[in-house]
């Protein structure tokens, strides 16, 4: 069984430990138009979703969490493509579309899991070049642009570039020291 984590008063519930209601809630968040718009595939069926969660039980390099704070579900965060030898992984977030905020709380908890619990050296992420809100969010949280995948995503008969961002443990530690 995969482990759940806590960061301050935030619970990170591993997808493999979700109850049936939480599984449906995650699917509702994921398929919400405001979330699906920025995903590589726009709609996920219940059958596909449940199979994905089942497959995660045998996938040590992919961790997905539902984040909860004081009974409120904030959204989902993931660390995927984890390479424990080279100590890096890919970060992903989608917040509860019915809440105004929550992304920053999820990000801080995910970074804690990645850098403190998993002892990773760096986190990487992909964001569509036209997702200005996400780009501003990650840059505000000290993620640095490291590259571009040209014409990587096909959406509405158009090819869109994907921007690559990263933060390493030094950037995480520097940011943590600023808050003391």
UniProtKB/Swiss-Prot annotation:
PROSITE patterns: GNAT. Keywords: Acyltransferase, Transferase. It is an enzyme of class 2 (transferase). Pfam families: Acetyltransf_1. It comes from the Bacteria. Residues 13-169 form the N-acetyltransferase domain. InterPro entries: Acyl_CoA_acyltransferase, GNAT_dom, PseH. GO terms for molecular function: acyltransferase activity, transferring groups other than amino-acyl groups. It catalyses: UDP-4-amino-4,6-dideoxy-N-acetyl-beta-L-altrosamine + acetyl-CoA = UDP-2,4-diacetamido-2,4,6-trideoxy-beta-L-altrose + CoA + H(+). Its EC number is 2.3.1.202. Signal peptide: none annotated. Gene3D superfamilies: 3.40.630.30. Coiled coil: none annotated. The keyword Nuclease does not apply. The keyword Phosphoprotein does not apply. Catalyzes the third step in the biosynthesis of pseudaminic acid, a sialic-acid-like sugar that is used to modify flagellin. Mediates N-4 acetylation of UDP-4-amino-4,6-dideoxy-beta-L-AltNAc to form UDP-2,4-diacetamido-2,4,6-trideoxy-beta-L-altropyranose. This is UDP-4-amino-4,6-dideoxy-N-acetyl-beta-L-altrosamine N-acetyltransferase. It comes from Helicobacter pylori (strain ATCC 700392 / 26695) (Campylobacter pylori).
